Structures are given as C-alpha cells and as structure tokens.
Amino acid sequence: MSRQYFGTDGIRGCTNKDPMTADVAMRVGQAAGAYFKRGLHRHRVLIGKDTRLSGYMVESALMAGFTSVGMDVVLVGPLPTPGVALLTRSMRADLGVMISASHNPFSDNGIKLFGPNGYKLSEEEEKAIEEAIDQPPLLAAPADIGRARRIDDAQGRYIHAVKSSFPESLRLDKLRLVLDCANGAAYQVAPAVLWELGAEVITLGVAPNGLNINDHCGSTDPSALQKKVLETRADLGIALDGDADRVIIVDEKGEIVDGDQIMALIATSAQKRNLLKGNTTVATVMSNLGLERYLSKLGIQLLRTQVGDRHVVEAMRAGGYTVGGEQSGHIILSYHTTTGDGLVAALQVLADLVQSDKKASELLHVFDPFPQLLKNVRYSSGQPLEDESVCEAISEAEESLKGKGRLLIRKSGTEPLIRVMAEAEDPDLVHQIVDHICETVRRAA
C-alpha cells in the first residue's frame, strides 16, 4: 500500500496543505483514537507540541478528533518530544502525540504518535491508522464523548526525569554554558535543568514567537552559538533542535562536536560502567567510518541501520542494545529514554566533562573523522540509479574505495533527489568519486 499520510517520521508537511490541514488532523485523531480504544477503561491521549504558530490549529483539530470518538485528552503545551514520550508512559496514556516538524521551518508542522510504552508506533500500526483516516469515523454516543484538560506540571515532571539521568554526586557549578534552544519546545525546560544543576547558563533561542523556531538557530545552524561561546569564553555550547530530540555540542574553541563524536564518548563511558549491552552501538549508514574504526579498537561493534532514528530504536530494541544515534545528533540511551533526547545526551557529555578535569576540546573530539562528502542530485523522472553508465560509475568507485573507504548512494524518501556520499582518508579521492558519480547521474536523469 502506498502511504498517503505517514512518512519516515509520522505525518509532516506544509501547514494548511495536505496532509497537514486541520481536517486531516481531526481525522487522524479519530482514526488513532478508535485504534487505541482497547479494553473497558476510560481511554486517554496525551498531546504536546513545540512552539510553531500552527500548533494551536493542529492541537485543536486533534483534540476534536480524539474526543469525538470517546477519548479523554490531556494537553501539556510546549514540551520536548522525549517529554511527551515519557509522560505518555508515566501517566498510563493509551497514546501520545507530539505536534512538531522537528528541525524544519515554522511553516511546516507534523504529527508524531507514541504508543503506551513511550515508543514511536510501528509501521504496521501506522498502516492500520492510515487505512482508517479516510473511512467514516466510529463516533461516540453523546454521553461517551471525551473530555479535555490541560495540566500545568508537565514541564516540572520532565525536568525531574532529565535531572535523574545525571549523577547525584556531580554539580555543574564550575561551568559556564551557552544554550541554544532553537526558539523551540525546550525554551523553558532546558535552561531550568542546567541552572538547577548549578551551571552558569547563557541562553539563545529562548524567545519563541511562533515564527522563529529553527530560524538561524539551534542544532541545524549553530553559527550564533559558536560565536557566543567564543564571546563569553564559555566552557561549552549546547544546541537543541525545535523539538529537542537532537543535540549538537560546541567546544570552548567554537568547534562543532557532532552526533558521531557524542556517541563515541557516551559509548566509551557506558562500556566502562558496564552499561553498553552486547558491546554494541547502533548508528545509521551515514555515521562516519572513523567512528566505526574507533569503536572497533575498543572491542565495540557498530551496527548500522537505514537513516532515521526510528530504525536505530528498532535495532536497539531487537538486540537489547543501550546506546545508539545519528550523526545529526539524535542520541538514544535506552537506560534513560525511549526516543532521542538532546538534553539527556548533553547531560551525559557534561558528566564526563566534569569528571575528566579536561577542557571540552580535549575530551570531545574522540576520534579523527574520515573526510566525508555528501552531495544531492535532483532528477525529474525515471530511475537514474538503474542507468548503465551510473551503475558502471558506482562499480568503479566501489573498486577504488575497497578496503579504504565507503560509498553510499540512496534516493531521498521525500524529494526527487539522489544522495551521493563517499568517505576515505584521501579527501581528493572522495571529491573525485562524488563529483564523477553526480555528473553521471545528472546526464542520466
């Protein structure tokens, strides 16, 4: 079945265009509500959101959909995605919903669904809900329509849970930190967590107006953070994205520390504390070969999945693994969370920094990354990867990289793009291979 509504991370799109309209959101609420109404108890759904202007519209539409099929609704307001996952489980809700388009601009929005266990829904569950969206809803009798209430202590509950991931014996009172919340969901909770743990906190991106989420700020654009770290002589910078499920670190020299380096540090620390189950770390095919080589020297296997934190989490659950993530900054620690949590990941980095008595630049650049180049080629029609000349160029490149690098070529799941990525110790070889394949794809497209 072709998926009309659900993509790689829930439902996402430009606001007021299919599928991100009020009408579709209401029907998603009705379909998901009917699907999760199992058993004879009163059924409850928890709904959180980030700071986009359209969040009000989507929240109201979902609330109408869920209550119309007899589900009670708990509204928690702006809260990071991992906070919604956490509260869904702790409040014994049948379903959790996060209204967010993550790192996308304010004009986009999305709907992410979590099961009662706090994990994102499986593709099978999404398929069942998708099939019901365009069907007549199973409306509740007038006396059975759901109720809605807003709770005020959701942020406090999440703050407490995040702080519990940080060793009780440690404090951050010797650190000056710059924190960029991307004008997003963590704009209140993240500064509170760091302040309560004793840090001096200098904030960026904490004045959301509905339109400025991820706008030249946050983990996808840490340039302002880098500048502020240098200006204030801070010990470290932390950049979250719009829904705070990913994090990028900046050291005291203004250098970026990506998700691969964060995973390397956390995996090393977890291994020492016997928390690295199966001596395995899970990452995607985009993670740098340098990470794989570094972990291998420690006897740690790197298990690679398709791109997307959903695939990382699925592999972690299937193998019972505890540490995983993506180069983009999604870090999943199953002994603390069920989904990526930028703030929890940042606290693990800070714990290591406090205990090491080193500067961030000395601690956080754990391995030397291989030169890596990624380019996108847009195509208009057809299957350019099946073209004979493209296949030949790919075969030649794979032969050139044999034993000394990696080549990854894939079609985008959301746009008509071919993504070409190569990495090797020789940067000239990397550029030569990527440019040649891109040009061959352009001619074939």
Curated annotation (Swiss-Prot):
What are the names of the required cofactors? Mg(2+)
Q: How is the cofactor bound?
A: Binds 1 Mg(2+) ion per subunit.
Q: Known Gene3D superfamilies for this protein? A: Alpha-D-Glucose-1,6-Bisphosphate, subunit A, domain 3, Alpha-D-phosphohexomutase, C-terminal domain
Q: Can you quote a single GO CC term?
A: cytosol
| PROSITE patterns per the UniProt record, alphabetical | PGM_PMM
Q: Could you tell me which SUPFAM superfamilies the record lists for this protein? A: Phosphoglucomutase, C-terminal domain (SSF55957), Phosphoglucomutase, first 3 domains (SSF53738)
Ordered alphabetically, the record's keywords are:
Isomerase, Magnesium, Metal-binding, Phosphoprotein
The catalytic residues are 102 (phosphoserine intermediate)
Q: Does the keyword Isomerase apply?
A: yes
Enzyme superclass (EC): isomerase
The UniProt catalytic activity note for this protein reads: alpha-D-glucosamine 1-phosphate = D-glucosamine 6-phosphate
Q: Which GO terms describe its molecular function?
A: magnesium ion binding; phosphoglucosamine mutase activity; phosphomannomutase activity
Q: Does Flavoprotein count among this protein's keywords?
A: no
Which residues are listed for Mg(2+) binding in this entry? 102, 241, 243, 245
PTM summary from the entry reads: Activated by phosphorylation.
What is the protein name given in its UniProt record? Phosphoglucosamine mutase
What's the source species for this entry?
Zymomonas mobilis subsp. mobilis (strain ATCC 31821 / ZM4 / CP4)
